Swiss-Prot record:
SUPFAM superfamilies the UniProt entry points to: F1F0 ATP synthase subunit C (SSF81333)
Keywords: ATP synthesis, Cell inner membrane, Cell membrane, CF(0), Hydrogen ion transport, Ion transport, Lipid-binding, Membrane, Transmembrane, Transmembrane helix, Transport
Pfam families found in the cross-reference section: ATP-synt_C (PF00137)
InterPro entries: ATP_synth_csu_bac/chlpt (IPR005953), ATP_synth_F0_csu (IPR000454), ATP_synth_F0_csu_DDCD_BS (IPR020537), ATP_synth_F0_csu_sf (IPR038662), ATPase_proteolipid_c-like_dom (IPR002379), F/V-ATP_Csub_sf (IPR035921)
Site keyed Reversibly protonated during proton transport: positions: 89
Gene: atpE
Family annotation (HAMAP family): ATP_synth_c_bact
Assembly description: F-type ATPases have 2 components, F(1) - the catalytic core - and F(0) - the membrane proton channel. F(1) has five subunits: alpha(3), beta(3), gamma(1), delta(1), epsilon(1). F(0) has three main subunits: a(1), b(2) and c(10-14). The alpha and beta chains form an alternating ring which encloses part of the gamma chain. F(1) is attached to F(0) by a central stalk formed by the gamma and epsilon chains, while a peripheral stalk is formed by the delta and b chains.
Designated name of the protein: ATP synthase subunit c
Function: F(1)F(0) ATP synthase produces ATP from ADP in the presence of a proton or sodium gradient. F-type ATPases consist of two structural domains, F(1) containing the extramembraneous catalytic core and F(0) containing the membrane proton channel, linked together by a central stalk and a peripheral stalk. During catalysis, ATP synthesis in the catalytic domain of F(1) is coupled via a rotary mechanism of the central stalk subunits to proton translocation.
Membrane topology: Multi-pass membrane protein
Length: 112
């Protein structure tokens, strides 16, 4: 597995180091970069939202179970749960920001 990963990274480095002088080729490359940016933004945000939803569900389930076992700790558990939910949601918002950057301010597109 390490050899395959090393080979993939080596090929990627060569591909990024290659320069092109033809504007037509660069425009075609920009189209592919835009297409894959849309795909990456959608998949990345979808996975982040799915992971966040699973994490929030587990957090709420654990808080409800803890409150059911010891009702006196309910307010403290709720406070901790809300802090945890904010941290989980922050990760999804970070993924959204990265997706928006990839869509609207893509640093990989070469302007002519």
């Amino acid at each position: 597995m390490k050899k395959v990963l090393f080979l993939l990274l080596a090929c990627a480095a060569v591909a990024f180091a290659a320069e092109t002088n033809a504007p037509v080729e660069q425009e075609a490359i920009n189209v592919w970069i835009k297409a894959f940016s849309v795909l990456a933004a959608g998949l990345g945000l979808g996975v982040a939202a799915l992971g966040g939803a699973i994490g929030m569900g587990n957090t709420a389930a654990a808080t409800i179970a803890g409150t059911a076992r010891n009702p006196g700790l309910g307010p403290k558990l709720m406070t901790t749960m809300f802090i945890a939910l904010a941290m989980i949601e922050a990760q999804v918002i970070y993924a959204l920001v990265i997706a928006l950057i990839a869509l609207y301010a893509n640093p990989f597109i070469v302007l002519q």
